[in-house]
Swiss-Prot record:
Keywords: Hydrolase, Metal-binding, Zinc. One of its GO terms (biological process) is bacterial-type flagellum-dependent swarming motility. Binds 3 Zn(2+) ions per subunit. This is Probable phosphatase Shal_1519. Signal peptide: none annotated. SUPFAM superfamilies: PHP domain-like. InterPro entries: Phosphatase_YcdX_put, PHP_dom, PHP_phosphatase, Pol/His_phosphatase_N, Pol/histidinol_Pase-like. It is an enzyme of class 3 (hydrolase).
């Protein structure tokens, strides 16, 4: 199946990434990607953009050359309370909010602490998608997290980058997550976690996990722009009408 949506990308605003937003738009056009989210790292990361970078995403057009661009962030889960490093009314101005564990912000601890932090973040209502929850550096109670995510209409990510250059050993956890989310009645999304435009929309290995779990396509947010936009609307993101042109093409 050709997936036309990517929810997880990084630009040169995160200085360990290597492509501009315009390069992503051009690559999306080239690959036939209809909708992608620009989700640079939250400001507590050492080389992340300033807080105001995310505030000023409002200047971005939502559709360029027939490609939809979601204004987003990959925030950092900061502590066991589940707080993230973007907050207040500014959250409402973003189209999509991702959050995950990153070692420079939240050092690996133990399974109980990781699970509590992730579930508290899910329960906060501030986050739409939890990124790379299968990271073996942060063991979690997978069934408990999947249940909390399903109850809160939060998607868990199968991160393609985790099978390539980062988070080695994620395969077993990601398959268990896909199966647990399926059992809990929740939602999955595949994210490229692209740090260079060439890997935009690359779900090659994540798709294998989804297929092994026999995960229902109707609960996979990448299946269409309509599916992701409906999810974000249900999550309370209001300003999505500008993407309607994507649904007409």
């Amino acid at each position: 199946m050709k997936y036309l949506v990517d929810t997880h990308t990084h630009t040169i605003a995160s200085t360990h990434a290597y492509s501009t937003l315009q390069e992503y738009i051009a690559m999306a056009k080239h690959k036939g990607i209809k909708l992608f989210a620009t989700t640079d790292h939250g400001p507590d990361m050492a080389d992340a953009p300033h807080f105001w970078h995310f505030v000023n995403l409002r200047v971005l057009p939502r559709v360029v050359d027939g490609v939809g661009i979601l204004r987003g962030i990959e925030a950092n889960i900061k502590n066991v309370v589940g707080e993230i490093d973007f907050f207040g009314d500014y959250l409402q101005d973003l189209d999509i909010v991702l959050a995950g564990f990153h070692e420079p912000v939240f050092a690996p601890s133990n399974k109980e602490t990781h699970t509590a932090a992730m579930i508290n973040c899910i329960n906060s209502g501030h986050v739409d998608i939890i990124t790379h929850p299968g990271n073996p550096a942060y063991p979690i109670d997978i069934e408990a997290v999947a249940k909390a995510a399903a109850e809160n209409n939060v998607a868990l990510e199968i991160n393609n980058s985790s099978f390539l250059v980062s988070r080695k050993g994620s395969e077993h956890n990601c398959l268990a997550i896909a199966k647990a989310v399926k059992e809990a009645g929740g939602l999955l999304v595949m994210g490229s976690d692209s740090h260079v435009a060439y890997s935009l929309g690359d779900f090659t290995l994540a798709e294998q996990i989804v297929e092994q779990a026999d995960f229902p396509i109707e609960r996979l947010l990448n299946r269409s722009p309509e599916a992701l936009l409906a999810f974000l609307s249900a999550r309370g993101h209001a300003s999505l009408d500008e993407y309607s042109v994507l649904l007409e093409s």
